[in-house]
């Protein structure tokens, strides 16, 4: 009998059981939290992850277009195109998307963190944020290198302008600050304008998460 190596991605997901008038109903923990308008963005930003997050946001909008969505981010970054699919959907849908950094938000993760609804972007106390310029790699014939180099520079300029708008920083400052890996603590992220507040405790129940 062969021993199958442990794959953490296939580890059991916790289940929760609810009592209803029709009996018991079980959910995996992420589906149960989705009912509370909570979405997780954990790990590398790539097309499959982006597709799932976009689908969840569209579903929650259809369920209640007036209720805020909470996007919890713990990501080292990843694909620009996949990240922009999430970003554009955040802006396209009617509900505000509140972003919360848990662990880390680096690269595209930091960009999406800053792109949450103004006044509703948060870091937990020991989270960290890292901003830098887009990374690119290309293999092909020499005549295509210039084309791809121009595209990477265009993406860099666009993302810097968007981050400047989200943070309130000057474009030139953002361009300088993202030229190399730039790590920020939770409070430094507030000072920079990437997030609005460090959350050490859950806000009071009087602070409604629904739009008025």
From Swiss-Prot:
Presence of the UniProt keyword Cytoplasm in the record: yes
Catalytic site positions: 107 (nucleophile), 132
Family statement: Belongs to the peptidase S14 family.
Subunit-structure text: Fourteen ClpP subunits assemble into 2 heptameric rings which stack back to back to give a disk-like structure with a central cavity, resembling the structure of eukaryotic proteasomes.
UniProt cross-references to Gene3D superfamilies, sorted A to Z: 2-enoyl-CoA Hydratase, Chain A, domain 1
PROSITE patterns linked: CLP_PROTEASE_HIS, CLP_PROTEASE_SER
An annotated GO cellular component: cytoplasm
EC nos: 3.4.21.92
The name this protein goes by in its record: ATP-dependent Clp protease proteolytic subunit
Subcellular location: Cytoplasm
